């Protein structure tokens, strides 16, 4: 196992730390990678956050409780407005878990030299494709052939039907990629910007004492970008969850 990081860009590289092998059975596919380690860490942080939120023995809520409840009610309002009804209540645990996983993974990746889970496009696109397939199967199971009416807006003139059906169909298929691509590309671009700027600033302040003193200005700019990336981490989790709710709503209510 090699835990030494030689380059900041290695936060985007999936590394294998441990693997099982046997002369009788091929176990090479059973490996412990940086992706799995950070995924376990993210889940552990979510569970720890939930435990800290346990406010049953306190009269006044703690800061952790207020923060967790704010996130909880934000997602609950989102699901009730987008989906609503019994379906919304049944799907809320999934939507809240999805939101928390993306949010915590984004925040963890802001730690210098940490692994950026959501910068892996194969993961984010794979997640969005799985959600898209689930929404499509839900729509077909609930509505049968009527589900295809989603591709034909009501009141469409007959000559425009073929064109609009093709456009709506392509737009629907693009959801499978756009949902994950939006998340992955935003996280990847933001982290690359931080890595490049941090490297340039480090080289600049290492030249002399004079440049070290001048480095206060670019360092303040870098801190501002870090704050911006922190906001983007939250916004991307919100956007991913809202769009997932919207896709599920289309599958359930056909509008």
Swiss-Prot record:
Question: Which InterPro entries does the record associate with it?
Answer: ATP_synth_F0_asu, ATP_synth_F0_asu_AS, ATP_synth_F0_asu_bact/mt, F0_ATP_A_sf
Sorted alphabetically, which CDD domains does this protein's record hold?
ATP-synt_Fo_a_6
As for subcellular location, the record says: Mitochondrion inner membrane
Q: A Pfam family matched by this chain, by name?
A: ATP-synt_A
The keyword rRNA-binding appears for this protein: no
A GO BP entry: proton motive force-driven ATP synthesis
Q: Which GO terms describe its cellular component?
A: mitochondrial inner membrane; proton-transporting ATP synthase complex
One MF term from GO for this chain?
proton transmembrane transporter activity
> Superkingdom, according to UniProt?
Eukaryota
**Ranges that cross the membrane:** 32-52, 91-111, 121-141, 159-200, 219-251
Keywords attached to this Swiss-Prot or TrEMBL record, sorted alphabetically, are: ATP synthesis, CF(0), Hydrogen ion transport, Ion transport, Membrane, Mitochondrion, Mitochondrion inner membrane, Transmembrane, Transmembrane helix, Transport
Task: Identify the propeptide residues.
Answer: 1-6
Topology relative to the lipid bilayer, per the entry, is: Multi-pass membrane protein
NAD in keyword set: no
Gene3D superfamilies in the record: ATP synthase, F0 complex, subunit A
Q: Name where it mostly resides.
A: mitochondrion
Matching entries from PANTHER family are given as:
ATP SYNTHASE SUBUNIT A
The annotated subunit structure for this chain is: F-type ATP synthases have 2 components, the catalytic core F(1) and the membrane-embedded component F(0), linked together by a central stalk and a peripheral stalk. The central stalk, also called rotor shaft, is often seen as part of F(1). The peripheral stalk is seen as part of F(0). F(0) contains the membrane channel next to the rotor. F-type ATP synthases form dimers but each monomer functions independently in ATP generation.
Q: Tell me the protein family, please.
A: Belongs to the ATPase A chain family.
Any idea what job this protein has? Mitochondrial membrane ATP synthase (F(1)F(0) ATP synthase or Complex V) produces ATP from ADP in the presence of a proton gradient across the membrane which is generated by electron transport complexes of the respiratory chain. F-type ATP synthases consist of two structural domains, F(1) - containing the extramembraneous catalytic core, and F(0) - containing the membrane proton channel, linked together by a central stalk and a peripheral stalk.
Its name, as the record gives it, is ATP synthase subunit a
Native organism is: Yarrowia lipolytica (strain CLIB 122 / E 150)
* Protein's gene: ATP6
């Amino acid at each position: 196992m090699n835990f030494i990081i030689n380059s900041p860009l290695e936060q985007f590289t999936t590394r294998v730390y441990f693997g099982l092998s046997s002369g009788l059975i091929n176990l090479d596919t059973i490996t412990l990678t940086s992706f799995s380690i950070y995924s376990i860490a993210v889940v552990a942080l979510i569970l720890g956050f939930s435990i800290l939120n346990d406010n049953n023995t306190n009269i006044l809520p703690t800061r952790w409780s207020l923060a967790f409840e704010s996130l909880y009610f934000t997602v609950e309002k989102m699901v009730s407005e987008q989906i609503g009804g019994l379906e919304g209540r049944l799907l809320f645990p999934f939507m809240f878990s999805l939101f928390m996983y993306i949010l915590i993974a984004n925040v963890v990746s802001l730690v210098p030299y940490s692994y950026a889970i959501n910068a892996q496009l194969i993961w984010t696109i794979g997640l969005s494709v799985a959600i898209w397939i689930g929404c499509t199967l839900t729509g077909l199971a609930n509505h049968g052939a009527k589900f295809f009416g989603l591709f034909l807006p009501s009141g469409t003139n007959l000559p425009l039907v073929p064109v609009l059906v093709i456009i709506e169909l392509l737009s629907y298929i693009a959801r499978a990629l756009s949902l994950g691509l939006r998340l992955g590309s935003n996280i990847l671009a933001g982290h690359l910007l931080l890595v490049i700027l941090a490297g340039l600033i480090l080289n600049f302040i290492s030249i002399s004492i004079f440049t070290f003193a001048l480095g206060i200005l670019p360092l303040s700019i870098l801190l501002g970008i870090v704050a911006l990336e922190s906001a983007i981490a939250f916004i991307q989790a919100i956007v991913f969850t809202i769009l997932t709710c919207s896709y599920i709503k289309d599958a359930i209510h056909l509008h």
